[in-house]
Amino acid sequence: MKTLLLTLLVVTIVCLDLGYSLKCYQHGKVVTCHRDMKFCYHNTGMPFRNLKLILQGCSSSCSETENNKCCSTDRCNK
């Protein structure tokens, strides 16, 4: 009986993937986000005429604007 319960517990953990963390691009590399970070962001700006600034990473909250794009799936902020 204990073996059956243990097997069911292991199967449940594997199926639910309790340790899942979002993966986002940050500085051109894929990073694993902290558990409370549910969004990837991609922010583009031009602080100077000939300089395009791109910021990418993980965020716990995200507001979408013209320059800031938000998404919630792995590697979606390229």
From Swiss-Prot:
Its main location: secreted. Belongs to the three-finger toxin family. Short-chain subfamily. Mambalgin sub-subfamily. Gene3D superfamilies: CD59. Changing residue 51 to A: 5.1-fold decrease in inhibitory potency of ASIC1a. The record marks 53 as: Key residue for inhibition of rat ASIC1a, probably binds to rat ASIC1a F-350. The record marks 48-49, 54-55 as: Important residue for inhibition of rat ASIC1a. Negative results: has no effect on rat ASIC2a, rat ASIC3, rat ASIC1a-ASIC3 and rat ASIC1b-ASIC3 channels, as well as on TRPV1, P2RX2 (P2X2), HTR3A (5-HT3A), Nav1.8 (SCN10A), Cav3.2 (CACNA1H) and Kv1.2 (KCNA2) channels. Does not produce motor dysfunction, apathy, flaccid paralysis, convulsions or death upon central injections (intrathecal or intracerebroventricular) in mice. Keywords: Disulfide bond, Ion channel impairing toxin, Pharmaceutical, Proton-gated sodium channel impairing toxin, Secreted, Signal, Toxin. It is found in: Secreted. The keyword Disulfide bond applies. The keyword Cell membrane does not apply. Disulfide bonds join 24-40, 33-58, 62-70, 71-76. GO terms for molecular function: ion channel regulator activity; toxin activity. This is Mambalgin-1. GO terms for cellular component: extracellular region. It comes from the Eukaryota. Changing residue 27 to A: Important decrease in inhibitory potency on cASIC1a. It comes from Dendroaspis polylepis polylepis. Residues 1-21 form the signal peptide. Expressed by the venom gland.
